[in-house]
């Protein structure tokens, strides 16, 4: 499955291409 890039919404760390899934103002996004 394709991975989620930084700045895009995610549900868990393992979805992210880089870094981790963190809570932001717009919901949870992948961050380096």
Curated annotation (Swiss-Prot):
Keywords: Disulfide bond, Knottin, Secreted. GO terms for cellular component: extracellular region. Disulfide bonds join 3-17, 10-21, 16-30. Its main location: secreted. InterPro entries: Toxin_29. It is found in: Secreted. Expressed by the venom gland. Not toxic to mice by intracerebroventricular injection. Belongs to the neurotoxin 17 (21C2) family. The presence of a 'disulfide through disulfide knot' structurally defines this protein as a knottin. This is U21-ctenitoxin-Co1a.
